[in-house]
Structure formats: structure tokens, C-alpha cells
Amino acid sequence: MTQMTVQVVTPDGIKYDHQAKFISVETTDGEMGILPRHINLIAPLVIHEMKIRRTDDDNHVDWVAINGGIIEIKDNVVTIVADSAERSRDIDVSRAERAKLRAEREIEAAKSAHDIDEVQRAQVALRRALNRINVGNK
């Protein structure tokens, strides 16, 4: 069986390291499906839900919340270097819900203050929280 190694690395260490037969990621150019023997590539990633079909279980899908970064594909090794990443089983959904509410409040306060930079920062925080909630509920 053809397979590839998938690793997700953050400043806190390796968050994911398994053999896979398919992964789905989202780059700045859109969604990308990756199979073994994919052409070598480096691309920037956006905040998204990464889907991984491992080789050891046809019916199981691993989900990882990726909060930006880059993907490198080289010689059947897929390495994602991300600012932060969490597997679905590790996400505290209630904490993510609180982060969502906090970000929504910060967006409203920044809009009232006409602080464009703060609005953008809070919008990124909201996207991250929503991503974590979606992945955590899978």
C-alpha cells in the first residue's frame, strides 16, 4: 500500500505524526487534496480543518485544527509547520466557545472605537475559535 508520513509541528512540539493515504488542507489558493507520491510543494496555509485518512483504519478520519502556517511535501513526507494546531480529541470545546464570545465582544468594541487593526486581530481570533469548535465537535 502506498502511504505518506504526515507530521504537524508547532512551537510546542510535534502534534501529529502518522502514516496516511489521504489528507485535505486549505492553502491561500484554496482546498487541496494530497495523495501519496504528490509532487514536491511548499505552500502557505490558512486557518482550517485538516482531514487525514490514516492507513491503519479505513473508516477513521483524524481531524486537526490548523491555525495558519506552511505545508511542505517532499518525497512522501508531508510536514505542516503551524503557529498552533490541535487534534479534535484534544480540544476543549467549552474553552473555544468562551474564546469565540470574547472575540465577538472584542470585534464590537474595536468597531465602536474605529480601531481597524484591533478589528482584524479580533476577527482572526474569532476564526481560530470557530475552527477549534468545528474540529472539536467532530
UniProtKB/Swiss-Prot annotation:
Record carries keyword Ion transport: yes
Intracellular or extracellular location(s): Cell membrane
Pfam families attached to this UniProt entry: ATP-synt_DE, ATP-synt_DE_N
CDD domains, per the entry: F1-ATPase_delta
CC annotations in GO: plasma membrane; proton-transporting ATP synthase complex
InterPro entries listed in its UniProt record: ATP_synth_F1_dsu/esu, ATP_synth_F1_dsu/esu_N, ATP_synth_F1_esu_C, ATPsynth_dsu/esu_N
Principal location listed in the UniProt entry: membrane
UniProt keyword 4Fe-4S, yes or no: no
Record keywords, A-Z: ATP synthesis, Cell membrane, CF(1), Hydrogen ion transport, Ion transport, Membrane, Transport
Topology relative to the membrane: Peripheral membrane protein
GO molecular function, one term: proton-transporting ATP synthase activity, rotational mechanism
Reported function: Produces ATP from ADP in the presence of a proton gradient across the membrane.
Oligomeric form and interacting partners: F-type ATPases have 2 components, CF(1) - the catalytic core - and CF(0) - the membrane proton channel. CF(1) has five subunits: alpha(3), beta(3), gamma(1), delta(1), epsilon(1). CF(0) has three main subunits: a, b and c.
Family membership noted in the UniProt record: Belongs to the ATPase epsilon chain family.
PANTHER family reported in the protein's UniProt record: ATP SYNTHASE DELTA/EPSILON CHAIN (PTHR13822), ATP SYNTHASE EPSILON CHAIN, CHLOROPLASTIC (PTHR13822:SF10)
Protein name stated in the entry: ATP synthase epsilon chain
UniProt organism field: Streptococcus uberis (strain ATCC BAA-854 / 0140J)
